[in-house]
Amino acid sequence: MLTLSSSEAAGRTGDGFVTAFFWRKNPVLERIQQVIAENCCGKLCSLRFTWSRPKRFATGEREFLYDTFAAMLDGAQQLAGAEFRSLYVEKVPGMNNLFALARFTNEVAAECELNECLPETMPDICFVKANFSNGHVTNQPLVGYFNEEGMVFATDEILEFPVAELASLPPANGPVEQMKQRFTEAARLGLVPPGPGNAAAIQTMIREALR
């Protein structure tokens, strides 16, 4: 069985940096796309993405900005269905911690909150929220701060919140792993479009916003 990382599945090569657009396979994002297509909640007005991970998963700044953050912006654009109008970024110097506000040409706005600074004992926190003129679609709990309730595996040393997935995939240890597993499986089945997509344009936009 061929196993690919998200980056490999997206076509990254050793001499170039290609963003892995794994948010496209986020199950909540896919559900929001379905709601948009069915037009059952009215007009899409705004989006909010949250990505928080323990410090042990912190990547280098380059990967954090041009892979993790860029993939989130791509996910927002997939839902907005329009070109970017502007991007505002506030980043904590020397840390993988930022807030961003992206606006699209159809007046949809997307808030992006990312950090890889959580205490080691905390699980991944990964939410998407879509605000429509007549309702909301989100996996963010109405009460509490962690991911939606599900399976729990706990010992004196560890605390895990596995996410049940397709029978063909193993239980994922949190929503980030689940999303990447789905992306890898989609690539294995030939469902991931080849090529870099609009990675270069998004990366350039991030550089300009950070100047």
Regions found by a protein language model. Give the residues of each.
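Short, amphipathic alpha-helical segments
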Residues: 23-26, 66-70
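C-terminal helix-rich "cap/oligomerization" subdomain common to oxidoreductases
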Residues: 1-2, 9-16, 105, 167-211
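Contiguous beta-strand/loop segments that form the cofactor/metal-binding neighborhood of enzyme cores
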Residues: 61, 67-149, 172-190, 209
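An alpha-helix initiation/capping motif
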Residues: 26, 91-97, 196-204
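A structural signal for the main folded, soluble domain(s) of proteins
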Residues: 14-16, 20-21, 140, 144-177
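A contiguous active-site-proximal alpha/beta segment in oxidoreductase catalytic domains
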Residues: 2-57
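Short, polar loop/linker segments at the starts of domains and inter-domain junctions
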Residues: 16, 62-63
